[in-house]
Amino acid sequence: MLKKILLLGLSLCTMFSFVGCTNSTQTTYEKVKEKKELTFAMTGQYPPFNYIDESGELVGFDIDIANAIADKMGVTAKPETIAWDGIITGLTGKRFDMIIGSMAITEERLEKVSFSNPYYYDGAQLFVMQDSDIADINDLTNAKVGVVTGTTFHSYLSENYPNLEILQFESDVDNLRALKQGRMDALVTGKFVGLSAPSKYGINIKVAGTLLYFEEIGVAIRKEDAELLDAVNTALQDMIDDGTYEEISQKWFSTNILEK
């Protein structure tokens, strides 16, 4: 009797696999196509790449790129905000499908996740208040410098400038606010984020010195999701070829930030 029940269960699973028996074997790409929904994460606090505008809407360059990728794949993009220091854990834990949140491609991160081809180029830049006498990072001795926790900016300063007191913040919005309040001498963030701060937040800051280092920014995807990675790279190339990328980049920066 038990044998008959087991055989019946196996037969039913075979017959009705389309309703759930084999869902566990679906790839992320197959699930995305089936649901027609692509979930992606960012902090929502990294203007002008991803942030909440005055009307409470999540906007920015990353958001437009994500929507365009989803459109090329024939699905809808669904964003999710999360703190930066937990974003890779969220991805590997399958909380969302990918990270489209201005994440730099690094050797350390490549040990945990895969990355798409770069979708823009950026660099770490030191910023100070407009009335500061600091010309570059070599002028900082036992100074306080702000960074966002878990960023490449934090690890770079820790390794190369041990004499600095590094203040950590959850977001660039908090980082910029602290500099304006005089709680530190300088901050390090992405070049484009700092350059947009005066117009975006009315924070009167300026560049101090040249880029500390150059970064390639990519879409982060779980290592096992090779099919999804291929689809994202194809979508990005299509966007470049048909002018979609140029249009988005010009909208936010008045230049093509994929050009070095």
What would you call each of these model-derived segments?
Residues 25-102:
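Extracytoplasmic small-molecule ligand-binding "clamshell" domains
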Residues 27, 64, 78-89, 132, ...:
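Short helix-initiation/N-cap motifs at beta->coil->alpha
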